Amino acid sequence: MAKMRISPELKKLIEKYRCVKDTEGMSPAKVYKLVGENENLYLKMTDSRYKGTTYDVEREKDMMLWLEGKLPVPKVLHFERHDGWSNLLMSEADGVLCSEEYEDEQSPEKIIELYAECIRLFHSIDISDCPYTNSLDSRLAELDYLLNNDLADVDCENWEEDTPFKDPRELYDFLKTEKPEEELVFSHGDLGDSNIFVKDGKVSGFIDLGRSGRADKWYDIAFCVRSIREDIGEEQYVELFFDLLGIKPDWEKIKYYILLDELF
């Protein structure tokens, strides 16, 4: 804790907690679990290079405050900008991570049901006063900034096997040229079983909300399709997912949004 760039006020708030660094996440944010006698908290930190991007925890703070009463999200306890860092202190989400509660091989139908429940929840939210719009224009402008400042995920070895591009700029050019029409709804922006909490068989919480906001309805759906294929692996469960949603898949959009995520 001594090496953290935090204010005296924040240090006082967390001094009685045992600090454990999270090593699971893939984002550039630093995340710490703060273990207390009666409760656990989380501290999430991003440096100034990410200010204004979807990685910026100030953006996540704004969305968490806006989502209060709309979705089950952690409570914002403290936010600050200090010594070149943005620091967000929040409560622990209620329930257990979906990825820990349900094994992909043992409970595939339940996981599909939860994904469909999430999509229905998101699409029911009124976005008229949502503070952020993650339209393709804004995401591609962000991606251009990240690429120009060596902040994008450019490890091509981690790309999907069928991604037909040689380098990040070639993929970026394709994404910019082939933008689909958008139908804006509320979107989580990074939906998967490691960002969903469950309790008594129902969705009980969401975390990692920095990319949430207005976005095309197929954005989160594409993430669900990718997760189902990678984690469960049987196409019948993709079909079940769309049956539960009561819609037909738009495969062009699904492919596009999976490609977009290759660089984040």
From Swiss-Prot:
InterPro entries: AGP_Transferase, Aminoglycoside_PTrfase, Kan/Strep_kinase, Kinase-like_dom_sf. Pfam families: APH. The active site is at 190 (proton acceptor). Keywords: Antibiotic resistance, ATP-binding, Kinase, Nucleotide-binding, Plasmid, Transferase. GO terms for molecular function: ATP binding; kanamycin kinase activity. Resistance to kanamycin and structurally-related aminoglycosides, including amikacin. Belongs to the aminoglycoside phosphotransferase family. This is Aminoglycoside 3'-phosphotransferase. It comes from Enterococcus faecalis. The gene is aphA.
